[in-house]
From Swiss-Prot:
This is Leucine--tRNA ligase. It is an enzyme of class 6 (ligase). It comes from Bacillus licheniformis (strain ATCC 14580 / DSM 13 / JCM 2505 / CCUG 7422 / NBRC 12200 / NCIMB 9375 / NCTC 10341 / NRRL NRS-1264 / Gibson 46). A motif ('HIGH' region) lies at residues 40-51. A motif ('KMSKS' region) lies at residues 576-580. GO terms for biological process: leucyl-tRNA aminoacylation. It comes from the Bacteria.
Amino acid sequence: MSFDHQTIEKKWQDYWLKNKTFATREDKSKPKFYALDMFPYPSGAGLHVGHPEGYTATDILSRMKRMQGYNVLHPMGWDAFGLPAEQYALDTGNDPAVFTEQNIDNFRRQIRALGFSYDWDREVNTTDPDYYKWTQWIFLKLYEKGLAYVDEVPVNWCPALGTVLANEEVIDGKSERGGHPVERRPMKQWMLKITAYADRLLEDLEELDWPESIKEMQRNWIGRSEGAHVHFAVDGTNETFTVFTTRPDTLFGATYAVLAPEHDLVQKITTPEQKDAVNAYIEEVQSKSDLERTDLAKTKTGVFTGAYAVNPANGEKIPVWIADYVLATYGTGAVMAVPAHDERDHEFASAFGLPIKEVVKGGDVEKEAYTGDGEHIHSDFLNGLDKAAAIEKMIQWLEENGKGEKKVTYRLRDWLFSRQRYWGEPIPIIHWEDGTSTPVPEEELPLILPKTSEIKPSGTGESPLANIKEWVEVTDPETGKKGRRETNTMPQWAGSCWYFLRYIDPKNPNELASPEKLKEWLPVDMYIGGAEHAVLHLLYARFWHKFLYDIGVVPTKEPFKQLYNQGMILGENNEKMSKSKGNVVNPDEIVETHGADTLRLYEMFMGPLDASIAWSTTGLDGARRFLDRVWRLFIDDNGGLNEKIVEGAGETLERVYHETVMKVTDHFEGLRFNTGISQLMVFINEAYKADQLPKEYMEGFVKLLSPVAPHLAEELWNRLGHEETIAYEAWPVYDEAKLVDDEIEIVVQLNGKVKAKLNVPADADKEQLEELAKNNEKVKEQLEGKTIRKVIAVPGKLVNIVAN
């Protein structure tokens, strides 16, 4: 008989909701466990089967920890600002707030149908003014400390769309939507000085229990480089420029210099003969994104400015070029080129016939750059030195001669924080007619995003908010001075930088969260989400957290103690699920046909949590069959309790039960859910062979099953005679003594070849083993007509009989 999943699942979901079973209480007498999911963006498409994989993992941990006596915080919310809702509003004329609310209602319904043990009283929504009041408050604190500033930076401007596009929205110099030309244009933007935290973001990675691959990605993104600044004079002028190099030891081999096309000096130093070529090149570069420009595989392009710089080490004149692979926003916007010892410089020099001068022995530099260590040559006072010694000596020489200095740089850039969009948090700053800017007073927060019937690009590069005059234009009540509100909004990253803090105290109107509660719950014990957020979200969240630590808001330096990335669920054809491929599996359909418990069990049993695995309908059916077997073991065909279930413990199933408790507990703790579930299956197989089913073990099994299949477990627990929910029952513990085998298997060898296997008492000594081996029927047959010369018995392992 199969169980009716639809009735059972609805019954228990209603029970949990009505009784607030999973509401987190403040209880300092228990140890705490904070299990966090990366909250979803509530898209119009709804939940897909990839979402529940991570959510089920944190739910299993949360349910197990509650039963182990922990006070568990397990919340859910919505990362609801963002471009898709705005695009929908542009396309349909509908309000993104209404669209977003409908999507959230749908997501919430889908998530509840999967039986996750969230505390719904703590739900947050980044678009709720009571929430983004505090996002704005954090921005003002960053502004107060000089960490939020305005800078002019090149952006992707699309004249046809009248808006600025993010790098991801530009493909081959054209807008992703509509294929319109895109050009680079300098524009005033808000920046956050994440670079001020670069060293701490790097160093504190060492303390985190995170996958090494994620830590390495963050290290690379921060990209700390030690080297030197070297100052070059432009020949025949008073102009100079500075380059950063990690290899100052190769300065004698610098045969040309390259400036970014946007570098301030370009127009000043370009000779009249080269003006046309330089300007044409600059125009060509404007439509390229930074990613395209720095692509290592692309053909090198560039133009000579006509100017020469003076190599500070040897006084030689070297030509100054411009090339698109040098970015004005990275480093100093200028590089010294040493083609003999740098691959990119070698390619460029070969393409344009520039000199290649060897200064480190070790390769054939005419053929390719030699980037290894070696003895320095053609380098005056560095000759004979290796790389490390030469770098140190050159930096000393540069500093003594005023030609440069030691320098640490980072690949990490300050965070471009403004978006020319409507659907985001308004930035609480007012720009006055006298050129000054002031923050909106704290007591006036939240600065609410105004409702508007028409969201369309301003056409000026400003956000659509610029069109709403009555909101934008303000007057200072004290001085009568006129001003304009900042019309840029914050990026979607802003709300997700700190949401885990608001869950701790979600209804607090007076502060981001109470210091006492933050102290109680931080750091997050387990954070599970997709690896696509490995760098940006996690880096930004760590940056804000460290800043909040510095100003005394949070008590910990790091937000997330342990991080785990679940793998991706692929379509049955092993391709990524996508609407265009038509291979998306909707969880609603699975819940309808197989049940939420089956979906949860299947996704955890597919394979290791961090692996990417193809969806399989056969596997899903198998998961359902297992749950049906569990049901039939407990419930007979008439709907009553199986009469084999008897009071007490008893010896039947004793060993496999204790082994199951040990393995399931250990494997669930280690996020090895697939192997934990395998052991639950082992127990059920053994139970089907037993004549009696001791109630203590059967109840223990239901507890072990409950984090994975909570609806079925609640129903069985109820049928076993319990009135209360299983959610806070004590997690089973195993007895080490019951895991020891009374009997073990040994092999019997005849002249070194295995002839039989015997089950013998675990404590059998040599004499007993010899006796048991000789009396074994199989062994007797083999010994017929032979004389035993010697018997070697090794307790716990083998008996070897030598006979001829």
